[in-house]
Curated annotation (Swiss-Prot):
Region (RGG-box 2): 161-223
GO molecular function: box H/ACA snoRNA binding
Gene3D superfamilies listed in its UniProt record: Probable tRNA pseudouridine synthase domain
Residue spans of biased composition, Basic and acidic residues class: 168-180
Free-text function comment from the UniProt entry: Required for ribosome biogenesis. Part of a complex which catalyzes pseudouridylation of rRNA. This involves the isomerization of uridine such that the ribose is subsequently attached to C5, instead of the normal N1. Pseudouridine ('psi') residues may serve to stabilize the conformation of rRNAs.
Name of the protein described by the UniProt record: Probable H/ACA ribonucleoprotein complex subunit 1-like protein
Record field: compositional bias (Gly residues): 181-221
Tagged with keyword DNA damage: no
SUPFAM superfamilies for this protein: Translation proteins
Disordered: annotated span: 1-61, 155-246
Lineage: Eukaryota, Metazoa, Ecdysozoa, Nematoda, Chromadorea
Length: 246
């Protein structure tokens, strides 16, 4: 009856199951747990298809929601699945349960395709439900809590630090023109097109085209300093002897 199960523990009766625990009876199952088994919400990577937190198979099915709303109409079948046109004006969750109007479950959303403004989805049917039983225009329903506003998938207009603006990843923000590793990635250096220190095309210290150490054709680098060794000041020159010509 510990407050929190240990890492790799069973989590039985604990307030929160351990990492890798079974989560049996715990308030929240462990990482890799059963996602269920009496727990309120399973851990990372667990089961619980249709449970409170969604996820994999074998968890507690809470049954149909209190309310369902129209999400789309049947368009055509594709092998054992059905394809529907979204008429809700919102975007459904992946793996969200789909129902008839009487809250009988039809299946679960498998794929969503199209643009934010005009899209559709495919449904993997529940056992015993046949794709051949649907007619064109048959209505399908969903829990309203499984819908997202379409604005989340539209580009942000004006101000803020949205993508492509002056913010992170933008033209002049963090991740500007001279970025690390990328064509215009974040920071300096790291092999970028105009990278700085590490292997950049016009970079600085380490092995760059005009770099310093190791490969400076006429500069100050160690090893391979062509100019200094030729003039007698380098490592391989004989600086103590002078040849006298009459």
């Amino acid at each position: 009856m510990s407050f929190r199960g240990g890492r790799g523990g069973g989590g039985g009766g604990g307030f929160r199951g351990g990492r890798g625990g079974g989560g049996g009876g715990g308030f929240r199952g462990g990482r890799g747990g059963d996602r269920g088994g009496g727990g309120f919400r399973g851990g990372r990577g667990g089961g619980g298809r249709g449970g409170f937190g969604g996820g994999g198979r074998g968890g507690y099915d809470q049954g149909p929601p209190e309310e369902v709303v129209l999400v789309g109409v049947f368009s055509h079948k594709c092998q054992d699945d059905i394809v529907c046109n979204n008429t809700s004006g919102k975007i459904p969750y992946f793996n969200a349960p789909i129902y008839f109007e009487n809250k009988e479950q039809v299946g679960k959303i498998d794929e969503i395709f199209g643009s934010p403004g005009e899209n559709g989805f495919s449904v993997t049917l529940s056992q015993g439900v046949k794709a051949s039983s649907f007619k064109s225009g048959s209505e399908l329903y969903i829990d309203p809590g499984k819908l997202l506003p379409v604005e989340r998938f539209l580009p942000q207009v004006g101000g803020g630090r949205g993508r492509g603006g002056r913010g992170r990843g933008g033209d002049r923000g963090r991740g500007g023109d001279r970025g690390r590793g990328g064509f215009g990635g974040r920071g300096g250096g790291g092999g970028g097109f105009r990278g700085g220190s590490r292997g950049g095309f016009g970079g600085g210290d380490r092995g760059g085209f005009r770099g310093g150490r190791g490969g400076d054709f006429g500069g100050r680098g160690r090893g391979g300093d062509f100019k200094r060794s030729y003039d007698g000041g380098g490592y391989g020159g004989n600086s103590n002897k002078r040849t006298k010509f009459d």
